[in-house]
Curated annotation (Swiss-Prot):
Entry's family note: Belongs to the skunalikevirus distal tail protein family.
Stretches that traverse the bilayer: none
Assembly notes: Homohexamer. Interacts with the receptor binding protein.
UniProt GO cellular component terms: virus tail
Protein name stated in the entry: Distal tail protein
Function: Forms the distal part of the tail. Self-associates as two rings organized back to back, with a central channel allowing DNA ejection.
Organism the protein comes from: Lactococcus phage p2
Major subcellular site: virion
Kinase as UniProt keyword: no
GO annotation (BP), single: symbiont genome ejection through host cell envelope, long flexible tail mechanism
Superkingdom of this protein's organism: Viruses
UniProt xrefs under Pfam families: Dit_C, Dit_N
Length: 298
């Protein structure tokens, strides 16, 4: 596979429009700089240096842009639609894929030329430049189901057997459930092995008038942040997005959306950066996540 580029108008949304700028009728060529710039604070005296902090910045990306319409009219329309789609959004997302990785960058339009340099059938050959918001990150889809009491989960569940109370022993290799477990929530935790800088989630609450959401624990089991809501009516689902540029906290009941920001437990929401540790569901039957992990250089 050669390098593939796509532009997403709303990567986290259901109305995402995708422009295939590798194989479509609007194409990108010759990126100016997909790398990074590093500024190092170094103190030197007589040739002896002391290394201070390092600041990483992401330079603008410039592409050569060409249209491949079959007529002058179509090429004008392609150019107009593409630029207007980008301008209609606060930012767009560049998908960059090769045989060995797939990463994303959030971009804001900085400059696009219009030199009217026609080619065959009135094709355009221009330059387009983007400012960098976030570059690069991976984007993963994850689904979590809460463990239920009495539910058999192959390879995970265990059974303790015996003939008298207080004399139960674990039977190795048997996949059964923790039937009768009084604290089933303690089994519904998932490991987080790498830092997550933002995520979008769809949460499915169970009980009304009971806090619902997710909480995050550090390596030693202490809660350091949580996104929890308390509503009078149980919501069909809760939509959250912790991206600072696209933040959302919405409850949905049928076709009615409710802003849940006022009913968030702010004392527990201490940071949007998710560290290595564990995640736990609170009063949820299921949760679906799209998570973003930072990768400065690929």
């Amino acid at each position: 596979m050669v390098r593939q580029y796509k532009i997403h108008t709303n990567l986290d949304g259901t109305d995402d429009k995708v422009w295939d700028v590798t194989n479509g009728k609007v194409r990108f060529y010759q990126p100016s700089n997909l790398g990074l710039q590093s500024t190092n604070n170094i103190w030197q005296s007589n040739g002896i240096g002391v290394m201070g902090t390092r600041s990483i910045t992401q330079p603008q990306i410039e592409f050569k842009l060409e249209t491949f319409g079959e007529s002058l009219e179509e090429n004008y329309q392609l150019m107009k639609d593409f630029v207007n789609d980008i301008l209609s959004k606060k930012f767009v997302t560049l998908e960059y894929q090769t045989e060995i990785f797939q990463v994303y960058a959030d971009l804001a339009l900085a400059d696009v030329t219009k030199t009217e340099g026609y080619g065959k059938n009135g094709t355009f050959s221009e330059k387009i430049t983007f400012d960098i918001i976030t570059k690069w990150y991976t984007y993963e889809n994850l689904t979590f189901d809460k463990i239920q009491n009495g539910k058999v989960i192959a390879g995970m569940s265990k059974i303790y057997g015996g003939t008298a109370p207080g004399n139960y022993k674990y039977i190795k290799g048997t996949s059964y459930t923790y039937y009768g477990e009084s604290d089933i929530d303690r089994l519904s935790r998932w490991d987080i092995k790498e830092e997550i800088f933002s995520f979008m989630g769809i949460l499915y609450p169970k009980l009304p008038k009971t806090p619902a959401g997710v909480r995050f624990l550090d390596d030693i089991g202490n809660e350091y942040t949580a996104i929890v809501f308390k509503t009078e009516q149980v919501q069909d689902y809760i939509l959250i997005n912790t991206d600072v540029n696209d933040e959302t906290y919405q409850g949905w009941k049928g076709t009615t959306a409710l802003n849940l920001f006022p009913v968030m437990d702010f004392e527990r929401y201490r940071t949007r950066i998710i560290e290595k540790g564990q995640m736990e569901l609170i009063n949820l039957s299921k949760a679906e996540f799209k998570i973003k992990r930072k990768a400065d250089f690929v």
